Amino acid sequence: FNFYRVEDTVTIQSESPFAVGEFISLCHSPKRRKLVLSILADGLSWKGMGEDTAELVPNILRFFSQGVIFDNSFSTAEYTYPALATIETGLYQHHTQIAKPGVPFVLDPSYVTIPEQMKELGYYCTNIQSCGQGIYNGAARGYDRSIVNHWMIPVVDGVERTIRHLETFDECDNFLFMHFADTHPYNADVSTPAYASAHLPLADVLQPQDRESSVFLKPNPLSQYVNRAEIRAVDRQLGYLFDYLTAHYEDDEYIVLLYSDHGTSVHACSPYL
């Protein structure tokens, strides 16, 4: 597909069937911000960073110190599928009824999602990067455009996509959703990163692997080391994005939200989920 700028009356026709998306209004409104950016850091445990927060995420702290940081905000679920529905609607799970992947339950049409509300306000709404968990159950309703990559949703791609989108649609008031999973601990299904195997003792690198779902992972040196290293890497990439935003927008022209859908068991102080 392609985007075409249309400034005069045009007629589009073809001998073959074709699809035309909804038009994108190229205008700003003083009633809106030029950008509202919603960033989901999958599995990021704010409490899990503990006293190392300043060392792990200096760019995040620097940027959001100009706004509001909530230290006591907690998820309503232990994994993404039900948590995302709550995030997008503001409703507890007993209202959304969305609990388990594979169960064919769709969000009731009477519940309005955040992108549906933003679209009603005139924003061009784009799901710039996500795993697609809210597509079929309706939790991600309302986006004009969705770019979905199952599992492979690294922050480096999300940041670059976001910047390129903003440069392409700079004449719009944009609402963007970016989801990355670098901060999510994984188990034996994922190879050990080189930086971990190069620095940790051999016994930690070759520890018996738990092949259960990562939400059940118990605290261990390898998972903790990798998770903190990935958090540090995410902060570097987000610092690049934040520098771009502050260089191209005035303070009152944008809103950025950074949040997580759940914590992680690898930093837990107890053996309970």
Question: What are the functions of these language-model segments?
Answer:
Residues 1-273:
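Catalytic domains that recognize anionic headgroups
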